[in-house]
Amino acid sequence: MDAPDAPHTPKYMDGGNTAASVTPGINIPGKSAFVELQQHAAAGYGGIRSTYQHFGPQGGQDSGFPSPRSALGYPFPPMHQNSYSGYHLGSYAPPCASPPKDDFSISDKCEDSGLRVNGKGKKMRKPRTIYSSLQLQQLNRRFQRTQYLALPERAELAASLGLTQTQVKIWFQNRRSKYKKMMKAAQGPGTNSGMPLGGGGPNPGQHSPNQMHSGGNNGGGSNSGSPSHYLPPGHSPTPSSTPVSELSPEFPPTGLSPPTQAPWDQKPHWIDHKPPPQMTPQPPHPAATLHPQTHHHNPPPQMGGYVPQYWYQPETNPSLVTVWPAV
């Protein structure tokens, strides 16, 4: 039984150390039968083990671990280890794409972050800085002194208030923009209010001559009624109203007030029922013209808009007045 062991031993072992370690195990009488059975049973695996052993020395002989186990009759653990190692490599070779898993996790994180951003609808903003009353007081004081801070001043102010330079800079920017808006708002109503004042100035002036005429002439209502009727027939005298108003005061002092009645007598050919009411205000007509004489300096621009009130003066055209004495 020992004879067949001899040829098997060199086939299983390539190193001298392993052979020396095997011989004592074979010579043990109690284990000889067990070793024989193990070796015969392993004869079928001899080719496989020989291949592994041949690969083992070629790959590296520094670890002679598989050879002693095969020599000692433990073929299954090495086969199991080899097969397991092969299975391990084979089974985990595809998942060896662990970097893709990491990438997937990273992409998941990115997607999560993207979802958070998309869920918010906008990017996260920094919280708004809340200034204390003391800080605002100091900032406003400094802003009243100067609207722009130099770098050293800004650093000093930020350090004294416990703020960052960026916060101080942004506060001053916002304060300057607010100040400009306030200035524009203050200037806008000023210009607009100036126009109503300019436009409102003539209104009192316009009312004052009316009141004066109404006070100067008790029959002003009749005069105001007559111009309303005389406006349609003659609009041409309106441009001559201004020169006549300036010239008319010159004639009444000369005692030409009686001839002023003649134009009214000549003009009423348009309307015959109006001369009687018009004759009554004629005597005070010079006095009425004297009142506008004193106020003609203020309301010359107003006469264009209120021609009907001065219509009785154009009736005293210088041409008619001068022609009447000649006749």
From Swiss-Prot:
An example molecular function term from Gene Ontology annotations: DNA-binding transcription factor activity, RNA polymerase II-specific
Quote a single Gene Ontology cellular component term: nucleus
Per the record, where are the segments of Basic and acidic residues compositional bias?
A: 266-275
**Pfam families reported in the protein's UniProt record:** Homeodomain
SMART domains per the record? HOX
* Bias (Low complexity): 231-249
Which Gene3D superfamilies is this protein grouped with? Homeodomain-like (1.10.10.60)
Main localization is nucleus
Q: What is this protein called?
A: Homeotic protein distal-less
Give the originating organism: Drosophila melanogaster
